[in-house]
A protein has these predicted regions:
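Glycine-rich nucleotide phosphate-binding loop and flanking beta-alpha elements
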Residues: 41, 68-70, 104, 108, ...
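Short, Lys/Arg-enriched, disordered terminal segments
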Residues: 1, 234-235
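A short beta-strand submotif of the Rossmann-like class I SAM-dependent methyltransferase core
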Residues: 95-101
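S-adenosyl-L-methionine-dependent methyltransferase catalytic module, highlighting the catalytic core
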Residues: 106-118, 124-233
Length: 235
């Protein structure tokens, strides 16, 4: 265990990614068919061990992504290169996940229409994304795309091939509920999660973020940087 997890434990803090992974652990049943939309090279980039456990639990794990990165995802049984309209199966998947994908979607109605088409009755959809009115999304929305990679590389060591244009058309509770309920889904849960990872590269800055969060939470306030974790169910 490195210094990052130790510091987060000291402040009783779990990252949004932890909650996202936990929601999959809770909802993915043995022999379920799992579709990961926008999965890229890794299902869980920072927890490959858990990703391997969960893909072993599923009967089939399928990925779809317009980036050729998906062809390098070793845990997938099958992969579709393209958007969700490329997915051939209908009424098939028991679990559909979108990890940090919603912010890139240019046509939410088209996306959710295909999610409804490919999801099985009683199936769940988990959306993990950034909240539109957090500082980072506001800054990225106001700056040109060519300027996005440098700060991501500095703060999170992100590779340029993992930086994509952003839209932020389904990044609030209202936007997500409107589009999913329109296509017949039921909202099972929705939470905002404090995201104290912007400065997690350094010990001092991580301590600072978590101290600010602790202070704000004492007054029942959120940390400024927020993520969304929403779960929807098809009747």
């Amino acid at each position: 265990q490195g210094w990052g997890p130790r510091i987060r434990k000291e402040y009783d803090y779990c990252s949004p990614e932890d909650y996202y992974q936990g929601s999959i652990v809770a909802l993915l049943k043995k022999n379920d068919k799992w579709l990961d939309i926008g999965c890229g090279r890794d299902i869980f980039p920072n927890n490959k061990r858990l990703a391997k456990v969960l893909t072993s639990r599923a009967k089939e794990t399928v990925g779809v992504d317009p980036s050729p990165n998906v062809n390098n995802n070793e845990l997938l049984d099958r992969a579709y290169l393209g958007f969700t309209d490329k997915v051939e199966e209908e009424n098939y998947y028991n679990l559909i996940t979108l990890r940090m994908v919603a912010e890139h979607v240019a046509d939410p109605d088209e996306l959710v229409r295909h999610i409804e088409r490919v999801s099985a009755s009683g199936g769940h959809v988990i959306v993990h994304t950034i909240y539109k009115w957090s500082p980072v999304p506001i800054i990225t929305k106001l700056t040109p795309f060519w300027a996005h990679h440098a700060p991501k590389r500095f703060f999170w060591d992100t590779e340029e091939r993992d930086t994509f244009p952003v839209e932020y058309k389904m990044n609030t509770r209202t936007e997500l509920n409107n589009i999913f309920l329109k296509h017949g889904f039921e909202n099972i849960s929705f939470v905002y999660l404090d995201d104290c990872r912007a400065l997690a590269k350094y010990k001092f800055s991580l301590h600072t973020e978590l101290l600010i969060r602790k202070f704000l939470n004492f007054f029942n306030l959120y940390y400024p940087e927020l993520c969304i974790l929403a779960v929807y169910k098809k009747p």
